[in-house]
Curated annotation (Swiss-Prot):
It comes from the Eukaryota. It comes from Mus musculus (Mouse). Signal peptide: none annotated. Disulfide bonds: none annotated. GO terms for biological process: hematopoietic progenitor cell differentiation. Pfam families: DUF5575, DUF5575_C, DUF5575_N. This is Uncharacterized protein ZSWIM9.
Length: 447
């Protein structure tokens, strides 16, 4: 007796209509959505066939060449994996496979993924027990590169050269740039076995979220010059990455890169992660840091930062603080063509060289700026004036300008970074930059 395909119910037809033409701007976005979608319906799908974006004829043309590691596939056919265990004692012939399927394709504009076809009528009932046994969150991402059990196990830990080699042996392909990033780290460990690297993967996904990097050379610099640390953060670098660097100030007053961190945009508590990793790599500097200068985001992490660096004064970089203040003033209607003097006034406030000068500038600000901005300023900035006004700066008596040092480092960094969107290329550029600095220092010593 031949089984017939069941007719779709009204509920199934509605589900199909909701799923059709749904768009996703990355394979990771689709995978996260699809995990939840399957969990709600107790169904397991697997990839029957696929074509990678890198193999398409348009892979080297804009905008696709910038999205190869983001979109991953130009075509994917997902079929229902009927996980019911067959009854070996039955004499009936095997049932045909479940007809449910979903097709995802690259959009005509080649900038997103679209569900182009779906048939959601199953030939079997949902089975919670079998679903719980067979379903693995993140399997669409894991199938492309690394098993998520491995990435979950090693995530948030320092990795040794042997760990990187082990991860490489498990890699099934270059998806998500994981293979490329691991190869960069393998090359780093080959030349610097004492380097410190911490990897963080997105939970239940074979996708690198954060990489902390410190070479043996920069660790030596940090241990030699731990007194003043500067934090330079470049959010949204190349549109796809956040980059953070910790700089130490040497005896000649130069900012030297001690450690760096590459992360997915919007990674929470990145500064805390950076400092924790730094102190784990060089625990002897904890009580020797006297000043830490960072961006305005440090204000929201003060308690954690002061616990990590109990002997350090915490400051906000004045240049970055001014940018934040002016941006907020624009948002609240206090910086426009009608009020062109606000920026100079904020600059005078931040650059005050005495408490008297600060009080005078503050009184002027209160009389000129809109009420909404003043309320914001009084709540968030006035109580912390000792963190961002010049006359309270730690380095003021040492003839140093922390903001200028950070700006100089940023210019040098941007000159050396490639116009790439991948974690691997950013790591490659950072490693090359550090070795170039080391070579230059060696040449100077030889002169």
């Amino acid at each position: 007796m031949e089984l017939t395909e069941p007719l779709p119910s009204a509920a199934v037809q509605k589900e199909e209509q909701e799923l059709l033409d749904r768009t996703f701007f990355s394979w990771a976005e689709f995978s996260r959505f699809f995990d939840k979608w399957c969990q709600q319906r107790l169904v397991v799908f697997s990839v029957k066939s696929s074509t990678r974006v890198a193999r398409s004829p348009w892979a080297n043309t804009p905008p696709l060449y910038r999205l190869i590691h983001v979109l991953k596939y130009s075509y994917v056919l997902l079929v229902c994996k009927d996980v019911r265990m067959p009854n070996k004692s039955t004499a009936w012939p095997p049932q045909p496979s479940c007809p449910a399927f979903i097709t995802v394709k690259l959009s005509p504009l080649r900038d997103r993924l679209v569900v182009t076809e779906c048939q959601l009528t199953h030939s079997h009932p949902a089975c919670p027990r079998e679903f719980a046994y067979h379903f693995r969150p993140g399997h669409l991402l894991a199938n492309s590169c690394l098993p998520v059990r491995i990435t979950n196990q090693i995530s948030k830990q320092f990795v040794a050269p042997a760990d990187v080699r082990r991860l490489l042996t498990h890699c099934k392909g270059p998806d998500h740039g994981v293979l490329d990033a691991l190869q960069v780290l393998e090359g780093l460990f080959r030349t610097d076995p004492e380097a410190k690297v911490k990897l963080v993967f997105v939970e239940d996904q074979a996708m690198v979220e954060t990489v902390f990097l410190l070479t043996s050379r920069t660790r030596a610099l940090l241990r030699r010059f731990p007194r003043i640390l500067l934090v330079d953060r470049l959010p949204g670098l190349q549109g796809t990455l956040d980059l953070m660097a910790v700089l130490c100030v040497d005896s000649a007053g130069r900012a030297r890169q001690a450690a760096c961190c590459v992360a997915r945009p919007g990674t929470p508590s990145l500064l805390r992660f950076m400092l924790v990793s730094l102190l784990q790599s060089a625990p002897d500097v904890k009580g020797r840091v006297r000043c830490l200068t960072a961006g305005p985001e440090v204000a929201g992490q003060l308690r954690a930062v002061r616990q990590l660096l109990p002997c350090a004064r915490v400051q906000i970089c004045r240049a970055q603080g001014l940018e934040t203040l002016f941006s907020k003033a624009q948002e609240l209607g206090g910086a426009s063509q009608e009020d062109p003097d606000l920026w100079p006034l904020l600059c005078r406030l931040a650059d005050s060289k005495s408490y008297t000068a600060y009080s005078e500038a503050l009184a002027e600000l209160r009389s000129q700026a809109p009420t909404a901005f003043i309320r914001y300023f009084e709540h968030n900035w006035a109580p912390r004036h000792d963190m961002w006004v010049r006359f309270r700066a730690y380095e003021a008596t040492r003839d140093l300008d922390a903001c200028a040092l950070v700006r100089s480092h940023r210019r040098r960094l941007l000159r050396r970074l490639s116009p790439s969107h991948s974690v691997a290329q950013c790591l490659r550029d950072l490693v090359a930059m550090q070795w170039a600095d080391a070579t230059g220092e060696a040449a100077l010593r030889g002169c």
